[in-house]
Amino acid sequence: MLDSQQILDAALRLDRAERSREQVRQFSLDYPNITIEDAYTIQRAWVALKIKGGRTLKGHKIGLTSRAMQVSSNITEPDYGALLDDMFFDEGSDIPFERFIVPRVEVELAFILGKPLKGPNCTVFDVLDATEWVIPALEIIDARIQQVDPQTNATRKVFDTISDNAANAGVVLGGRAVRPTEIDLRKVPTVLYRNGVIEESGVSAAVLNHPAKGVAWLANKLAPYDVTLLPGQVILGGSFTRPVAARPGDTFHVDYDLLGSIACRFI
């Protein structure tokens, strides 16, 4: 376990890395005894720094929802991070590339809550009951921590990703919002185009067999900390495509079939 000073130092390093756009060394190398709980404590400390600086919590994200990603990360459950007010971009907007380090785009569904949601024992049915709208969403992920250590060639571990706010950096909401019982949320097909070329496609069932399962998992995971998911919060349910790298000048268009589409451009 890390001590309180190590936790604060790590959070400050992440904050400086985001501001300077210069990645820091992997925490899993600097702190070989780091645990999953340490990583979440670092994440909470970094989010607290941001909120102290004027940011507002707007919701949460769920990551590592596919079985393949969990196996590759040597874990058996998803991870989560915080969504802050300055992470949201309008659909169709120009997104400044200079704000990020190595941005990538993922395809998701977002749950907009209409009622409080709290574990333990939260189920998919509780999530559907508490959700006011489901809407297409793009998540922009980034890495403030080095993905590969230049000295050892070690790849980052799940401890690094969790500390790094589960890699979250931005959100674009768009397309057609629907009530959670209006469609089968498992069967939303998507096609992602980058500069007019199909790069990824997927279906929403790839998220834990039902995207609402991730939201239930999050409510249960946060229950020991007495955290309630609140009305109006945005919950990103997890990606059902592989991430696609974004470069300056890239235009993204994602077709969600009956739920419309989302477009954005990095400048």
For the regions a language model picked out, list residue spans one by one.
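Short, charged beta-turn/beta-strand-edge "cap" motif at the junction between a beta-strand
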Residues: 240-244, 258-261
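N-terminal low-complexity, intrinsically disordered patches enriched in charged
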Residues: 52, 241, 247-248
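A short pocket-lining beta-strand/turn micro-motif at the edge of beta-sheets
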Residues: 225, 230-233, 250-252, 260-262
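Conserved phosphate- and dinucleotide-binding cores of soluble alpha/beta proteins
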Residues: 202-206, 214, 224
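Catalytic-core "active-site belt" of small-molecule-metabolizing enzymes
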Residues: 2-209, 251, 259-267
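A conserved acidic, glycine/proline-rich C-terminal tail/linker
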Residues: 215-243
